[in-house]
Amino acid sequence: MLERHIADYHFIADPTTGMTMRWGTTIKDNPTWAPVPELADISISNHCSKGCSFCYKDSCINNDFLNVEDYCSILDSMNHPKYGNVFQVALGGGEPLEHPNFLEIIAETCRRSIVPNFTTNGMLLTPKICGSLSGKIGAVALSVSSMADLELKKLAFLIDAGIKTNIHYVLSKNNLEEACMILRGCYNEKLNGINAIIFLTYGSKYHRKQNLSSYKNP
């Protein structure tokens, strides 16, 4: 269990299940914010070979990678002398799995008792890579903008390795009907074993200009 107790703020997390509890002076108090960071988002590259139109970073093939030494320096800089380190990091890109030192980055994160999570397009997921990540990852999120893009075998690789798997479904005016179908349970069988599906509305500069409010639910 991970614990942090600071004056009238208390936090407990189970890194295995992902369960967290926060309370204030008493168990009934709900703190507005944490006095020190608990999670950090870290972009380890801006390199990606897929070129999704909705990418909020407009990532491309540029071999722009954060080196392991600098990554470790970032982790160590977040270690408070009194209250300790952040509990989790969310690794993004670019495509994290295209980073040549990705497994080393995961190892360095775990060595500091920080739980790593990451978002991926899933193209490079294999049974071998999922096996290497098993027991080391809090959760993996697969980014899609269509259920047709969601490969069942990629989901199976993660689920069979015991890795908690989420879906990041990126919304646009072109897929709102499908998003509503997801909410109605039309894809429950395909999503069996998924921890959560999260609908995201942000994206590239072009994507953000689309007017989602123009959609009318049939």
Predicted regions, residues:
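N-terminal [4Fe-4S]-dependent radical SAM core
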Residues: 1-41
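A short, flexible beta-alpha/helix-coil linker loop
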Residues: 26-29, 58-62, 203-206
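A C-terminal junction/extension of Radical SAM enzymes
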Residues: 2-3, 188, 193-218
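Active-site micro-motifs of SAM-dependent methyltransferase domains
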Residues: 50, 98, 204
